[in-house]
Amino acid sequence: MVEQDGATAAGEAPEPIRAHRADYLPVLLVPALAVAALPLIGNPVTWLTLTIAALAMGMMIFVIASGLTLVFGLMDVLNFGHGAFIAIGAYLAMTTLIPLAGWIQADQLALNLAALGLAILVAMAGTSIIGWAFERVIIMPVYGQHLKQILVTTGGLIVAEQLIHVFWGGEQKPMPLPTALRGAITIGDVAVEKYRLLTMAVGLAVFVAMLLVLNRTKLGLLIRAGVENREMVEALGYRIRRLFVAVFVAGSALAGLGGTLWALYRETLTAGIGSEVIVLVFIVTIIGGLGSIGGCFLGSVLVAQMANYTGYLAPKVALASNILLMVIILMWRPQGLYAVTGR
């Protein structure tokens, strides 16, 4: 019996993971929502512009939320401090870009991308290190204690925001967008911002990379097995503690990447940037299903669609509309679009 379970944990996908691969019904929600929005918006060009903007926004949210959903699913940790990594990553990227003003303002795409790539590398490296320390000092003592997790991680977020005020000041900062990524490409009557195309490419690349790691590597199989049954993985002799740390650090790095993309999208930066986006990130995590990368990806697109469509039609209810979306989906599927765990 142990050998059979071991094969499931380390060499074969758990049954719920295999089962949801063939479930394409939730995917239909994306085109259904888009079609439903068209008559309300009226103008097809405006509708298409909003839809493209939603895809770009969805990719940024996915990058941020993907790490958090694995932390939720594998570690069973309610990390409200995830917003701290979003903000710190964005500020580290800004600090890196400012001395590279010559590269950013150059007309050469290679220099622009080199500056952006270096800023992203610094942001991800910095948030990885901070994430490791955060897990050791704040998360580890409260494993299995959800109320304490909420309190201490929220406290960590507040402390991080205050430290940002100390090191970078409390005023709003400009986030320099490279010259080559400014402006838009016109396709027919639709203007598509260049930067949005980049964010879509980055988001898709992260999604594909995570799928490959989770489905084609031993580490990925262990992570998926840990999401499904942590006790069985430990019984097989694997050190789930190390897996916890690796996943938390990776999630922190992705938050740093997502924070950088989000700040560049806004072209401004404040200490509260993490708090501003973390609500949408948690909605995505809950909608998608704890531990499900596919569900997180789909949930990110749905949330971004709802935010963009309602933001155009009725800006005051944009956030409320996403909460309503979450309620409707949970009434339909209480464990999320693609439930991986039974928790």
For each predicted feature, which ranges?
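Transmembrane helix-bundle core of multi-pass membrane transporters
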Residues: 137, 141-216, 243-246, 267, ...
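Single transmembrane alpha-helix segments in multi-pass membrane proteins
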Residues: 47-98, 133-147, 282-293
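Peri-membrane helix termini and adjoining interfacial loops of integral membrane proteins
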Residues: 5-6, 99-103, 170-183, 300
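Cytosolic-side transmembrane-helix boundaries in multi-pass membrane proteins
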Residues: 1-36, 148, 152, 167, ...
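Helix-loop-helix "hairpin" substructures at the membrane interface of multi-pass membrane proteins
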Residues: 191-269, 293-298
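Alpha-helical transmembrane segments within multi-pass membrane transporters and channels
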Residues: 103-156, 163, 298-303, 333-334
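Transmembrane alpha-helical segments in multi-pass inner-membrane proteins
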Residues: 67, 111-112, 116-124, 245-255, ...
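Membrane-interfacial amphipathic/re-entrant helices at transmembrane-helix boundaries
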Residues: 1-64, 92, 104-118, 145-150, ...
